[in-house]
Amino acid sequence: MKKEWKEKQTSLGNAIIISAVTLIIGLAIGFASPNIFSNFAPYLGLSSSSSDINWSALDEVYNKLASTYNGEIDKSVVIDGAKKGLVDALGDKYTIYMNSEAASDFNDELHGNVGSGVGIEMGLRDGYVRVLRTLPDNPAKEAGILAGDIIYKVNDEEVYSLSTDEIASKVRGETGSEVTITVVRDGEEKSFTMKRETINNVSAFVEYDGQTAIITITRFDNDTGTMVQGFAKEFSDHGVNKVILDLRDNGGGYVSAAQDLLSLWLSGEKILIQKSKHYGDSTTSTKTGKAILSDMKTIVLVNGSTASASEITAGALQDYKKATIVGETTYGKGVVQNLFDLSGGTMLKVTTADWHTPLDRSINGVGITPDIEIERTYEDINTMKDPQMEKAKSL
């Protein structure tokens, strides 16, 4: 039966139900001890003395499965399932457990070490993971994959229900090896077979259009702030009198990188307010020093995939009236995650706080509304048209 591709939304209630089932299955299928918690709490990062969770219900499920389940049990897989289930049951899409492989991929991607792939950037749009753009001179672009395509299969495995990170890990592989990606475009399936290549994916680069400097930032990693500060120091040599900061399709990264970037426009100013149940309220400010772009005419480009640290940047520049924001309403990720390294190379990413802009605006689930709203369609992207950039250049 042919699958119908419609925009979809998963309700929070359904997500919690699914996650709760995952938790029970993850805990139940593999333990050989009659007491789950006391034997495996150390693997979960918990202690029996400090926990007030009643684990007897899970013990009951386990005991029944332990006496009836017909199959081999892999303890490491079960422990990973238990950890993932505990986290997924929270129903927070930003709080995730990563096994050692996923954690390694996450760190590599955050630092731009994506290895070998086909050169596509993906993100969640209208309920599906879609191609946001294809990188120039890379296999996906040459094969004909387009922005807006839904990622349906990788090597004949259906992946459309997986997360962006999970799909990305399946697309990557050995340099020179083949991968077949099936996409859905206008309701029709199209398959593309490509050879993986080493992908060079820097976090920031600058181009010049006359006296306008166009800075594109694809993510906020450890080097981003330093790179852009280096660009800015050369602006006088190019006679720059306007900066366009392109944050479109930038899903964020390190808050500290946004802090370094904003120090080009703000000196010792508050850039966000954090509100946390466990850590209390706090503020983050830029370093005190010469903000060399403080008086520079600045336009920031944003869209629906501009999120997290990118929204911190756009929100602060908008609040302080240091820039004109152009494009589409941003994603609306007004929460902060901290990374915690766990045993065995695993990792926990946990939502630890809400964040507001310097003027105490909450953007979570709402996004930042541009000062000038202009849409850029998938058709525009695929035909190399950019009305948002053209507007920014005209200001």
Across the structure, where does each feature detected by a protein language model lie?
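PDZ/PDZ-like domain segments forming the peptide/carboxylate-binding groove
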Residues: 51, 113-153, 157-161, 222-225, ...
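Extended, small/polar residue-biased N-terminal targeting/export presequences
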Residues: 68-130, 178-179, 186-193
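Extracytoplasmic/secreted proteins, especially bacterial periplasmic and envelope-associated proteins
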Residues: 53-60, 64, 77, 81, ...
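Cleft-lining beta-strand/loop regions that shape enzyme active-site pockets
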Residues: 132, 141-143, 147, 155, ...
